[in-house]
Every structure is written in C-alpha cells, then in structure tokens.
C-alpha cells in the first residue's frame, strides 16, 4: 500500500469501528467482549475516546465529537456521578478516561463534567502511595509502581493542578517521574522495567532493585506518551521541572530507538529480545512510540530528526498488520491483549509470561494509539 492509501484506509477504519460501537457494546474492547459482562468505566474505552476527540480537533468532523459525547454521557450522570466508577477502588487505570472530561467541559460547559472531574481528582487525594510519594498502581497491588500508571493518571493530575488547583500538585507529579527514573531505568539499555515493588515482597521483584525482570513494550509506550502529555499540560513557569521531564523524554526516545527493528520499523513485545522464539513485533507499543514522537516533535519537545523514526514505526505497523477482509471490513492485528504483574494468574514478568498473553485484532489498546499517531500524521 502507498502512504496515501494507508491514511485513507485508517480514516475508513475509525468510521467502521464507531459505526459498530456504543458505550454498552464497544467492539474495540476485546476484554469486555470476551467477558460477556456489562461495560464499565475503563481506560480502554478512554484510549479510544481520546483518539476520537483528537480526530475531531484535527479534522473538524463533528461526528467524532458527537460519538464521544454520547459515549461519555452514558456514564456521566447529570449530578456528576459516574456510573460504575468507585474512587475508593484506588485503581489508576480508572483515571485515564477523566482526561476526556476536560475536553467536553471546555466545549459544552456542562457542570456535570466539572463535577465528574472533581470526583476523579478526589481519588488521587487519598490514593495510597509509596514511602517516596508515588501513587500505588492499584490498591490491590500495594507498594507497586507500574509504568502504565504514569499514562493513566499523570496527564489528568497535571491538567487538574494547572487549571483548577493553582499548580499545587505539579511538583508532586514531577517528583513521581523522577522517582521512576531513579528506580526503574536500566542504566545499561536506558529502558525502563515494567514494574517496581518498593517493599520487594512480590515474587516478581528483584530483591535488590525491586524491579520486574523485563522491558515490556507497551509499558514503555504508555510511559513515553505520559511524558509528552504531561509536558503539554504543564506550565513552563515550572522551568526546572519542565526541562527535567523534557530531558528525560528525549533521552528515553533516543534509547528506545536503538531497539527499533531495522526492516519493519516496529518494536518487539519484549524489547531487548528480538527474534527470540515466541517474541513478536507488537502493534500497540509501536504505535505509542510513533504517537509520542510525532506529538513531541510538533510541540517542540523533541528534535525534528526524530520524526523519521516515528513515520517508519507508523507505516511499518500499518504495512504489517492493517488489512482488509473479504467483506470489506478492516482489521488491525498484532495487539497484545493484556499484560500485568502478580494477581491470581501468578504473572511473573518472565519472557514466557509476556509471550503467553493473547494476541488479538481491533483492540483499542492498539487502535487508539495508532489513530492518535494518524491524527498527528494528517495534521502535519
């Protein structure tokens, strides 16, 4: 396919997904589809709605905004409560969808959105923390910091503090990133481990460092986008903190780029084990890299020379995994459905574990980031 054909196909693909989805039955939430349970407020839908709102801002096509509002309004009640959301669950994943409420509040001015934003912010007020001050990823994972959580919570936190709280929590957010850098970055590769257990109690945690054993691509992807999204929302008056996260972002992109597959432009599910049996070129993490770099370049956070790395990742992913079915429908393959640490399934962070999780098509954890990268491509 030519680049023009790929961009055209992606536009059709998003239209196909939203035409066949609703808040009750989002076809892109494969975990929900497989469970057969009613839909809940969740980060997966949040990724897709973020992508739809970005498409609206880029194209001006109101169908993306209308769909997003209808979807969110299914959950956000007139009094600002959020159906199925419980702040006391203390799950950072549930904060992610809150970013979209700022957009709808700005566009429509409805008080229920501001109340819902405040409700989600109340979770962070009492979210358990490590002794050094980082949010626990979830209440059910005590003393643990996961890279994923930076994307799920920090952009929302930074936007709230900047807009509504006189920047009181902005330094706190910055310090959480610095703690992650100190504990979770591998000095040899520059990559970051998926998880960190301050207590060193979990079976997956290194007894010395507290880190999990491997570099999972999507976790790195979430982390890269988190830095870009936080900087987008951060006031540059916080000069040292702003420059600190920006320098960390640039260094991370430089280090990650070294693991980009020369032939396809993609990245491997476990990043530093290319070609190992069971490993594969993975869509969601590659798309997150492309999006983080393209957006970082557009915002002036990253040097322009890096855009070529992102384009290679973007088109490489589409060439390998975006296809048209005989019935004319489109699908995006190569998406790791889920990966975590601990829990009832004894997820130990080993290579065998990361290779064992299902690989699916059309899940928003891959589709959302690819569409976000697509919006950056067409906005140039």
Predicted regions mapped to residue ranges:
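CBM-like carbohydrate-recognition segments
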Residues: 2-44, 63-65, 74-92, 96-98, ...
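Alpha-helical scaffold segments in carbohydrate-active enzymes
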Residues: 12, 16, 54, 74, ...
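Short linear capping/connector segments at secondary-structure termini
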Residues: 30-34, 135-141, 195-199, 267-275
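Inter-helical turn/loop segments and adjacent helix faces that build the functional surface
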Residues: 59, 108, 160-171, 230-243, ...
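Extended ligand-binding groove/face enriched in aromatic
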Residues: 66, 77-205, 324, 328, ...
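Short, contiguous, pocket-lining structural segments
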Residues: 145-152, 165, 169-172, 207-223, ...
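Oxyanion-binding "anion nests"
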Residues: 224-274, 278
